[in-house]
Curated annotation (Swiss-Prot):
InterPro entries: Ribosomal_uL10, Ribosomal_uL10-like_sf, Ribosomal_uL10_bac, Ribosomal_uL10_bac_type, Ribosomal_uL10_CS_bac
Stored PROSITE patterns: RIBOSOMAL_L10 (PS01109)
SUPFAM superfamilies: Ribosomal protein L10-like
Keyword annotations: Ribonucleoprotein, Ribosomal protein, RNA-binding, rRNA-binding
HAMAP family listed in its UniProt record: Ribosomal_uL10
This protein's name: Large ribosomal subunit protein uL10
Family from the record: Belongs to the universal ribosomal protein uL10 family.
Taxonomic source organism: Variovorax paradoxus (strain S110)
Length: 177
């Protein structure tokens, strides 16, 4: 199906706005993937905040021109699906995880932070934990010294007082009587 000029401009405009918001672009060849598998990939991507698009490569090149993803314009050949995500690792994770279970989806490359990524770069990006997991790990690291100190103080109080109530409680009871 051929697009007329106004439809092409609309596609370019949509993809340009996607590229402006996105941190990551992942490209994968989808030759031979069934419609059911593609639907499953798209629904998984949608749930993770990733936008997948099958575009004509010339339209994709024009859409990313002037953006951080322009550096991968020369890699835009063949039947590709483009994954854009605002989360730095989401697009790479979705595509790499799907490629593990479906050998017909072949990662071709991508871009992140103004740098082109090869296949290994996309896979390394996919192995980075998500933002939520990283924040949870950071919080755990920050809480660890505090909880250790609390355990040491509790053990010290147990050792000194033999498990009795703190001495501050006794004067409060005497004043109430």
């Amino acid at each position: 199906m051929s697009l007329n000029r106004s439809e092409k401009e609309a596609v370019i405009s949509d993809v340009t706005s996607l590229a402006a918001k996105a941190q990551t672009l992942v490209m994968a060849e989808y030759r031979g993937i069934t419609v059911a598998d593609m639907t499953k990939l798209r629904s998984e991507a949608r749930s993770k905040g990733v936008t997948l698009s099958v575009l004509k490569n010339t339209l994709a090149r024009r859409a990313v021109a002037g953006s951080a993803f322009e550096i991968v314009g020369d890699q835009m050949t063949g039947p590709l699906i483009y994954g854009f995500s605002e989360d730095a690792v989401a697009a790479a994770k979705v595509v790499a995880d799907f490629a593990k279970t479906n050998d017909k989806l072949v990662i071709r490359g991508g871009a992140f932070g103004g740098k082109a990524l090869d296949v290994n770069g996309v896979k390394q990006l996919a192995n980075i934990p998500s933002k939520e997991v990283l924040l949870a790990q950071l919080l755990g690291l920050m809480q660890s010294p505090i909880s250790r100190t609390a355990r040491v103080l509790a053990a010290l109080a147990e050792k000194r007082g033999g498990g009795e109530a703190a001495p501050a409680d006794a004067p409060a009871e005497a004043q109430a009587a």
